[in-house]
Regions:
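Hydrophobic faces of stable alpha-helices that mediate helix-helix packing
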Residues: 9-12, 98-106, 128-131
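Acidic-glycine-rich active-site phosphate/pyrophosphate-binding loop
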Residues: 17-20, 106-112, 177
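Structured surface interface patches that mediate subunit assembly and partner/cofactor docking
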Residues: 1-6, 29-30, 35, 58-69, ...
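Alpha-helical scaffold segments in carbohydrate-active enzymes
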Residues: 14, 41-52, 104, 130-137
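Short, helix-capping/interhelical loops that line the mouth of catalytic, cofactor-
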Residues: 1-3, 51-111
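An N-terminal domain-cap segment
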Residues: 1-44, 55
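Short amphipathic alpha-helical segments enriched in hydrophobics
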Residues: 12, 19-26, 46, 50-57, ...
Length: 244
């Protein structure tokens, strides 16, 4: 895969620079893509993800939470705990903690050091994809779109697309052809029964659960979208449309 460590470091820098100039009111802005979280809470979460990935405490059931309500509840409690334990800390302290963790995590993402024993095979890609998603969640909450050309955004699309293919196989669904700009590929096994075309950023947001069902249905489908709608994202789709 492409430079996971470089993409993560770049996205970490981008989010850090975005947050650096925010006052307390802006940090308390609700994030529509992450109900019950504020901008500050998202920073606490991505810092917690770095801590768990580097420390060997990443929730291993996350990959299967899409198909198991108990795992989904456990995943939600895991991420809530990351936020809860850091909620009262100043942003400067969170950024400093994140930077310290990155000194361990980024060499691991680069493959220079092994992940902690017992880590899931997908651990190297997950923090990058998660950070890419939340970078745009925060931008959307603040009304400051941007970073669509960030390396993590492009990698996030590919990672979430690969996870979609795994869900399609596990769910016994037909393969799906994806078109993102001038890129085209198939996820799943066998001949695709439909295709989905979108701008790369829009496809990334759809596959990462940041588009409502109506928004997903309105995308450029060729073929019946129904067999794919409940598996397109690994999380419940938002009830209302999201703009970013």
């Amino acid at each position: 895969m492409a430079d996971l460590a470089g993409a993560y470091a770049d996205a970490r820098r981008r989010l850090g620079e975005l947050l650096a100039g925010l006052d307390e009111a802006a940090l308390a802005t609700p994030v529509p893509a992450c109900p019950a979280w504020t901008v500050r809470d998202v920073l606490a979460h991505v810092t917690g993800v770095a801590a768990d990935a580097a420390g060997g405490t990443y929730f291993a059931g996350a990959a299967d939470a899409w198909s198991d309500v108990r795992l989904a509840a456990a995943r939600d409690e895991w991420t809530a705990g990351q936020v809860r334990t850091r909620r009262q800390r100043p942003v400067e302290a969170l950024v400093a903690e994140w930077a310290g963790l990155a000194a361990t995590l980024e060499p691991m993402l680069a493959g220079a050091v092994p992940p902690p024993p017992g880590s899931p095979a997908w651990l190297r890609s997950a923090p990058v994809a998660d950070l890419a998603v939340h970078l745009h969640d925060v931008r959307g909450a603040l009304g400051r779109p941007g970073d669509r050309d960030a390396p993590a955004t492009a990698l996030g699309l590919r990672i979430y697309a690969r996870w979609l293919g795994q869900r399609l196989d596990q769910g016994g669904r037909p393969a799906l052809r994806l078109r993102a700009g001038d890129q085209e590929w198939v996820e799943g096994t066998g001949s695709p029964a439909a295709s989905l075309a979108a701008d790369p950023f829009e496809l990334f947001r759809a596959l990462s659960g940041r588009r409502s069902l109506d928004q997903v249905r309105a995308l450029a489908w060729d073929g019946d979208p129904e067999p794919y709608l409940d598996l397109l994202a690994p999380y419940p789709l938002p009830p209302s449309p999201l703009a970013e």
